[in-house]
Amino acid sequence: MKPFAVLGLGNSLMGDDAAGVAVAEMLARDPTVTDRAEVWTAGADVLRSMDRIDGRERVILVDAVECGEEPGRVSVVDQPPLDRPHGHAHWLSAAEAVELMRRAMPGLRPAKFTWVLVHVASIKAQEGLSAEVAAAIPAAAAAVKALIP
């Protein structure tokens, strides 16, 4: 098992919600990343990846977030707020899912979760990313690469 994991979250049928998927697909083609990290798309449910997450040194979750910030902006955070309303297609936010995993499995490893968030204007049923979000995919991929020693 590689010590690092990168999960691209999102739904490709929900427009900009697929930002995390696009980043993961880009990183999965980069041997400088795949030599050190396992990269996969996790759809819209982090909990389905629980068995693949446990035992990692660090897990990086890449997701779209609709929260009023400029579309295409990339943020790196260790813990998104749990009490902030989330605008995305998931039934649980990534932060809520990780908190649920930690409570259900007190010995859950990794010790560190990090989120790379791509800010979007809206998430709605459509195929393809908006121009602003598509332009941000390389920056989000670079942010992930910077987190993998």
Regions found by a protein language model. Give the residues of each.
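N-terminal catalytic or cofactor-binding beta/alpha core of small enzyme domains
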Residues: 1-122, 127-138, 144-149
